[in-house]
Amino acid sequence: MNKFCLLPFHGKRIGVANIPFTILFKKGPYFLHSHITAVYYSTKGKNDSHEQSRVSKKSTFTPLETPWYLRIVDNEKELMEGKKNNHHTMNKELEIPKTSPNSLRKIADLLTGKLGLDDFLVFDLRKKSPNSVSAVNKLGDFMVICTARSTKHCHKSFLELNKFLKHEFCSSAYVEGNFNERQESRRKRRLARKSNLSKLLGRSSECSAKDLNSEAWYMIDCRVDGIFVNILTQRRRNELNLEELYAPENEKSKFQNIDSGNVPTISGVNEISSNNNILLGLRRLAQQRRRYSTINPNGLSNLRYFLQKEDFKGANKIIQSSSGTETHNIRTLEHVKNTLKDLVGQERKVDVVQWKSLFDEHSTFLTINQSAAYWPLRLEYAILLNKADPQFYSDRVFLKDYLLLKKSLGQELIREDLIALLEMVLKTQHSSHSYFNLVKQNRVIIRALNLFKGLQTEDDGSVVYDEVVISLLLNSMVADERVKLRSLYETIDHIFQTFGDKLTSGMIVSILQNLAKIKDWNKLLQVWEAITPTEGEGQDKRPWNEFINVINQSGDSHVISKIVNNGHLLWIRRLNVNVTPELCNSIKALLKTAGMENSTLEEFLVRGTNNQ
């Protein structure tokens, strides 16, 4: 039987021993060992030295190793020193492109030092050949790729990086791939409703929800010096192989996966089909130059279904559930516009108030900033609203809802904007063609023209002096034979003084038509003779065909006889006018109305010209 033995201590001596001490259990007797030899103090005389030496020999033992709980602090110190050494080594090996901004160095130190991200790579996208330009080249200058240990590590790294950017550069990062708890729970519910995960995720059916949640890819736009940061888990990084996408042409071979079977994937399948190859899809996006929509086709069909039924609550839910980037919002608004265009083309009665509210609700400031795509879309949408209900969406509403809004947001008005307003003014119907209603319309035009002061066209001319604009302005000054603005004649005289011999055919035709509409034939002939070239100037290029048609359509026999008998038509031969088949038909119709069909004058004007 094993015995437990203790060292003998003498009763007349006081012993003090330092702790700790241990009890060693062996097959033999149990002994109590102390690290330090015990020191004793005695009150005896000379015999104390002999007794003390005897006890000291018995109390001297072999020292043991330092216990684990005393080695914890030392181990932590060694670990911290090792991390510091590794960090210094990593900083030495960290390759940053030359002439890169200091912000890139600070971000790199944060990612590799404090956040502990591995496999740090930086690609300089500033100098690329035109043949290898992708969408990322136009967005950023530096592409950073690094590896995290888990999805939580990715998320934590993004949060710390965002805090760092706000503190150091006063910039807020934009991230793709960051799923919050609500989105993640919604994602899990959708996966639970799907029996075939491969159709939903584009991966092998062996993939599970656990595998999906264990991998992550955060793409972060730092909004500082064109720096983009990609934080991926190791498996996702191996699968995507973004290095091959962003590397220069002469270095792509370094990052190519020679044996795809050795690359770990989420599904664990060695063979990757072309439909499931994410890198192949990224290559296509980089090489092609087309506008790409991220809207789900099913979502588009559902949105169209609700819009055709004018169920705006359901349409709002679909748009809000699929909200994304500014380009995505432009696509959605364009789809709304196309649906309204189809309904208006079918002459269906639509709720213009709800359609306008739907478009305005989803026209955010970020979407409006996409001026190249947004404002032409809004202009076309406004024209459709006016066509659907001119009384509700009138010219005055268009002036405030489009022209003033666009001008107040710092956007430049263009020629098409003014033309759209003038066309709406002409379409607006009033209960009676009175002079006061015409004045009201003219006030809207005056307010609009004040917004276009100083604007130039592509030909360095004023927008107001555009040929189409002048024609529409003249048409807006005349309602019928009895109602016209008093400024009509002043406007015509101003046009003649401004353009002189450079009057275009469109301007001349518009002046003739409006004078014929008010039946002011004397002013019409005065204008026509004022632009008559002399015989030495060459061929007459006035719009003779339109002039004769205006006279013939008036149906006034007195005016027609005056044109024929006073010799106005003889100028066609005198000035070598190019007699086209259309002009021949117009001359015959005019002479037939005047009762001079098959006359000598017709033979002289038409047949004589044909013989030449």
UniProtKB/Swiss-Prot annotation:
InterPro entries, per the entry: Atp25, ATP25_mRNA_stabil_dom, NT_sf
Signal sequence: where? none
Q: Which GO terms describe its cellular component?
A: mitochondrial inner membrane; mitochondrion
Biological role: mRNA stabilization factor specific for the 0.95 kb OLI1 mRNA. Also involved in OLI1 ring formation.
Transit peptide endpoints, chain numbering: 1-14
Q: What is this protein called?
A: ATPase synthesis protein 25, mitochondrial
Q: Which GO terms describe its biological process?
A: mitochondrial gene expression; mitochondrial proton-transporting ATP synthase complex assembly; mRNA stabilization
Q: Which UniProt keywords apply?
A: Membrane, Mitochondrion, Mitochondrion inner membrane, Transit peptide
Q: Which family does it belong to?
A: Belongs to the ATP25 family.
Look up the further comments and give them.
Present with 2430 molecules/cell in log phase SD medium.
Pfam families per the UniProt record, alphabetical: mRNA_stabil, RsfS
Q: Which gene encodes it?
A: ATP25
Name the Gene3D superfamilies for this protein: Beta Polymerase, domain 2
Where found? Mitochondrion inner membrane
* Topology of the protein relative to the lipid bilayer: Peripheral membrane protein
Q: What is its main location?
A: mitochondrion
